[in-house]
Structure formats: structure tokens, C-alpha cells
A protein has these predicted regions:
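Cytosolic, long alpha-helical scaffolding segments
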Residues: 1-179
Length: 179
């Protein structure tokens, strides 16, 4: 996520391409982890807490893979668009979404219910921020501030991808209670 948003901020095409390539590695890691979890289920036949942990891990890796997909989608937009001032607007979601991912993973690893709850609370903040960013970008077009329709749509999509990343972080945080 950080590499994708840095690439967007700096207009760094090389960094954006690295993000797209890294998504393939994330996809492979998801497959490998899923295979390990299924092997544990078959060979160990876990019950109770162990079963909940494996189930949570299976769901969590799906969210992590989707976060990688969203970062890759941001990178694809960076590669096709020139850097503009309007990009800063869509980047308002970058830090909150990235922090939510870090915090949700930390909450899962540390079994920190308080941190998980904070992540879940922050989801509403990011949702509101997305609506604000969307409205601002639409106003940029309406006020002829040099933002073309296609670029505005791409930047709204970047903001939406970041909002979806926050949603996936929330899903991970919700699994802390379950596991």
C-alpha cells in the first residue's frame, strides 16, 4: 500500500510497476498459506480454538490478497495517468487505510481486542473521508480547475480502492474476536 501511494504521490512509474509485480507474489503466498491451512485441517483435525484460528487465517489471507489487488489497481492507474495536483486529494485516504491494515494485522497477531475495535471504529471515518474526497473531485470538474473527467474518475477509483483496503482491514480486525 505504501509503495503504491508513494508511487502515486511521486509519479514514480518504476515503483508502480514493482507494486504490480508484487501482487503476483502476494497471490502465490495466499495459495501457499491456504494450502498449509487445509493440510492442517486434514492432518490434524483441529477443534475449538485451533479450528477457529485456522478458519480466521483462511479468511484473513483472502483479505490480505485483496488488499494487494487494490494496491495493484492503484499502481495501474498511476502508470496510465500523469501526476496532477488533484492526486493529493485522493491521497487523503492513504495514511488512514494503511494504518488500519497495520493495526488490524498487529491486533490479530497480538490478540489485541482494543486495537481491533479501534480499527473497526476507524472504518466509518474512512468511509466519510471517501465521500468527502469524491465530492471534492466532482467539484474540481464542475469548477473547471483543470481536472478532466477521465482523470477525475481514475482518482475517485484510487480513493475507492483505498476505502476498500480499509474495509478489508476491518474484516481482519473483526476476526480477532472470532479467533
Amino acid at each position: 500500500i505504501g509503495k503504491a501511494t508513494t508511487a502515486l504521490k511521486e509519479g514514480n512509474m518504476e515503483q508502480a510497476e514493482k507494486v504490480r509485480i508484487a501482487d503476483e507474489e502476494i497471490d502465490q503466498a495466499e495459495t501457499d498459506i491456504e494450502r498449509l491451512c487445509l493440510r492442517l485441517l486434514l492432518q490434524q483435525q483441529p477443534v475449538a480454538r485451533d479450528l477457529r484460528q485456522i478458519s480466521a487465517a483462511l479468511k484473513m489471507i483472502t483479505d490480505m490478497e485483496r488488499i494487494g489487488d487494490q494496491a495493484s489497481d492503484i499502481a495501474e492507474i498511476i502508470i496510465t495517468e500523469d501526476k496532477s495536483e488533484a492526486q493529493d486529494i485522493s491521497m487523503k485516504l492513504s495514511e488512514p487505510a494503511s494504518k488500519m491494515v497495520r493495526d488490524s494485522v498487529n491486533a490479530y497477531v497480538e490478540k489485541d481486542l482494543d486495537l481491533a475495535r479501534k480499527v473497526m471504529e476507524n472504518d466509518d471515518v474512512v468511509d466519510e473521508l471517501f465521500e468527502e474526497v469524491k465530492t471534492t473531485l466532482i467539484n474540481f470538474i464542475a469548477e473547471n480547475k483543470g481536472l478532466q473527467g477521465v482523470e477525475a474518475i481514475d482518482l475517485i477509483m484510487v480513493a475507492k480502492y483505498l476505502e476498500r483496503i480499509a474495509d478489508h482491514a476491518t474484516n481482519i480486525a473483526e476476526r480477532v474476536e472470532f479467533s
